[in-house]
Amino acid sequence: MLDIDKSTVDFLVTENMVQEVEKVLSHDVPLVHTIVEEMVKRDIDRIYFVACGSPLNAAQTAKHLADRFSDLQVYAISGWEFCDNTPYRLDARCAVIGVSDYGKTEEVIKALELGRACGALTAAFTKRADSPITSAAEFSIDYQADCIWEIHLLLCYSVVLEMITRLAPHAEIGKIKNDLKQLPNALGYLVRTWEEKGRQLGELASQWPMIYTVAAGPLRPLGYKEGIVTLMEFTWTHGCVIESGEFRHGPLEIVEPGVPFLFLLGNDESRHTTERAINFVKQRTDNVIVIDYAAISQGLHPWLAPFLMFVPMEWLCYYLSIYKDHNPDERRYYGGLVEY
């Protein structure tokens, strides 16, 4: 196990998470509402979120939210996919919202430039006001925070929640917006109470050479964020992500003793689908971890699961890396260390 002061590890964002979420709720979400007001004035009826990595997964979650509770046309597209295969419809009734923490992601900047050239409303969500991405967008929000999963998810959710509220109100959207007020306290509770459990699960998972992550519903994008982005980039663990409903269509054939699985189990309508996969796997291997939203939700809406489930996964992945004697901040290639 790596001997390290966790307060020095940039990967671990639990320390200031609650304060950052409180700040975004009080200061930045109203700025999102101002942008949405302009979108409504311009009769925007199609939204393209463009991002990469974790920010893309946050945007995908918001896209699923829109699909579930509205007929709003929302897309979440990877940067180069947007640039290389630019949507046929890109005009003045479209919005292109680029999400990039450092604001230097070239393909996201290029996507905003493409959108602006076609007359689309453009906005950027980034950490700093002087980020390069802000010059490519008509509107920008610099959130000045480090817990990017929570922040990006909150900002993208706020776009969708406000658009639905203004254009086609839905009872569930009102419940989600109301429960968001309780988010800081709920996150704080998990930060305080889940570290030891995360340590135990991280130690267990550190013995596995790779991990299959399985999720469904609103947790699908978080499954990718944790099972691919976090495991590969930060813990140097081989990973693969499977959608719960697709588990029986091929993946079930690799289940056998010793094969490791991590399940993210929500309490939305897709719960039974993931439970079916869990039951199948548990009969054939003991290497199973289940993170269950029902056990940590504190009564919050099922579509807030991606916010809360992040905390157990943050602790698990941090300790997984530490037990593998790896500092999750260490890189071999990423961030310009090697030309790509």
Swiss-Prot record:
Highest taxon above the source species: Bacteria
Domain annotation SIS: ranges: 35-169, 201-331
Annotated metabolic or biological route of this protein: Carbohydrate metabolism; fructoselysine degradation; D-glucose 6-phosphate and lysine from fructoselysine: step 2/2
InterPro entries from the UniProt entry: GlmS/FrlB_SIS, SIS_dom, SIS_dom_sf
CDD domains xrefs: SIS_GlmS_GlmD_2
Chemical reaction(s) catalysed: N(6)-(6-phospho-D-fructosyl)-L-lysine + H2O = D-glucose 6-phosphate + L-lysine
Hydrolase listed as a keyword: yes
Pfam families in the cross-refs: SIS
Annotated function: Catalyzes the reversible conversion of fructoselysine 6-phosphate to glucose 6-phosphate and lysine. Functions in a fructoselysine degradation pathway that allows E.coli to grow on fructoselysine or psicoselysine.
Listed name of the protein: Fructoselysine 6-phosphate deglycase
